[in-house]
Amino acid sequence: MMNLEEIWQQVLKQLQAEMPRASYETWAKDTQALSLEKNVLTVCARNAYARDWLESRMTAIVQNILNGILDHPVSVRFVASENPEVE
């Protein structure tokens, strides 16, 4: 069984292959997986703007990748690193 970091690295690897390089480096590269609880993966983006971009454009893609890696449905939730709940 892969740990959280390994799972997220697999997701990032696939995103890197599928996204334009500039978009990947701007939005996805610096994200971190915070937790995987009750089939919800919480991912930290560097700020609220990045969180909103990822949420609107990448949620379905990331969920599809996760479903392939984990072999069961997983939801993804993006949070911004300046949120108090993340610290």
What are these regions (language model features)?
Residues 1-87:
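Intrinsically disordered, low-complexity basic tails and flexible linkers associated
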